[in-house]
Amino acid sequence: MAAKDVKFGRSAREKMLRGVDILADAVKVTLGPKGRNVVIDKSFGAPRITKDGVSVAKEIELEDKFENMGAQMLREVASKTNDTAGDGTTTATVLGQAIVQEGAKAVAAGMNPMDLKRGIDLAVTEVVAELLGKAKKINTSEEVAQVGTISANGEAEIGKMIADAMQKVGNEGVITVEEAKTAETELEVVEGMQFDRGYLSPYFVTNPEKMVADLEDAYILLHEKKLSNLQALLPVLEAVVQTSKPLVIIAEDVEGEALATLVVNKLRGGLKIAAVKAPGFGDRRKAMLEDIAILTGGQVISEDLGIKLETVTLDMLGRAKKVSISKENTTIVDGAGQKAEIDARVSQIKQQIEETSSDYDREKLQERLAKLAGGVAVIRVGGATEVEVKEKKDRVDDALNATRAAVEEGIVAGGGTALLRASAKISAKGINADQEAGINIVRRALQAPARQITTNAGEEASVIVGKILENASETYGYNTANGEFGDLIKAGVVDPVKVVRTALQNAASVAGLLITTEAMIAELPKKDAAPAGMPGGMGGMGGMDF
């Protein structure tokens, strides 16, 4: 076992704080409408330019192992916020850094870290309740567009496009973001369906960078039982190979020998194929397979209907222009089903929704209806160069996630104003001085996002924050984009509550862990062995020419 380096107390926390600061200082310059770009070197191709906090955080790896631990813990704040809310990663990083810095000072002054953490948790719980209480529900397409615009760093075109997409496929509909082949950014709505099952083996992936399997103009085999042996499938597999088209198998499961054989064939390049578990369970699985069959113009291979695998022909398989399979989801785009049959199926599901008395069944039926009737919206992001397209795509992804979050939990005034106002409303009391100090840490940290946004815009943060707090109106704040004070909600400067809430909760959670750290352990760097000396007995070579 390799030797370890162990650091304790203050020296451990100082190293960790250094790592936190390096990561946060790189990420926080991107915050706000006047946030700066970060350029990331890539091992191949052009450098990447981004304003996406989590993309910057993911690139940072420090040489010093103890500093790196601090940086990676803060990176977790950004990643977790991105996973839950899809946006707000930079805000979360700024909050995390502020809480850790203040907390480290308090611990250095001799305060109890556990009581500090309890105080921080008390304050955060109260602020979250305050934010949810102040949230304004969004109903109109204009409000949706405003949220998208803010999250896309003030680009109104992106906000409007996302609002249009949500209007066309519904709030629960599937919206995907792709790189365009042209310089224009455009929206396309395609009939399609997505379900929450991914590929059964990563070897089916066709795009290793994104870890997705994209199969164009594919056949789709729908089977309601498990496949553990491919013998019965050979006739249909051979028929598909003759057409040179890809095949997607959707079955209860594909296991053992069957899965291994498919993977080997895919790797050898003889068969473009992917296997996916069927969505749902029991009777619901049968119904969802039937939905997919109607959407793709295929048949469910079921022994109940007297169809055996050995007798399957190409015309029993479904067809789709594109099937995209990630680790967790499968999207079927532009299935070959007849419109009349799809409409009949939609009517049937609507009828079932009206008749059912179970809320759970109704919810599941509505999900199926959205999948069948909603379609898939595709936003194709264009730009003059590949670097520009990638940077813009990051912003569109953020804007889309923020918009979904806003529809879910509502909005509050943006620009860090909601947190700034909440800091003045904290009334929680600790049971001792150290818990009070923890509450005060959160009070001060809540000002950090607003201060950073104004600093990035080249303004004096203390003056702006002071002026905002002088006005009692909840929605009064500073619009950094045009340099004016006023009602931020009316001006369209808004943040989704879910994003702000998640950023604060994750920042406080990880910061609390960092403050209460008393020891750190890392592997010592390996010492390179001294190179062996030249063997003796090599004399007598002086007469050779070199």
From Swiss-Prot:
UniProt entry keywords in alphabetical sequence: ATP-binding, Chaperone, Cytoplasm, Isomerase, Nucleotide-binding
Binding site for ATP: T30, L31, G32, P33, K51, D87, G88, T89, T90, T91, G415, D495
HAMAP family in the record: CH60
A Pfam family assignment: Cpn60_TCP1
Gene: groEL
The protein's name in its UniProt record: Chaperonin GroEL
Keyword Isomerase applies: yes
The protein's Enzyme Commission number: 5.6.1.7
Subunit (UniProt): Forms a cylinder of 14 subunits composed of two heptameric rings stacked back-to-back. Interacts with the co-chaperonin GroES.
Subcellular location: Cytoplasm
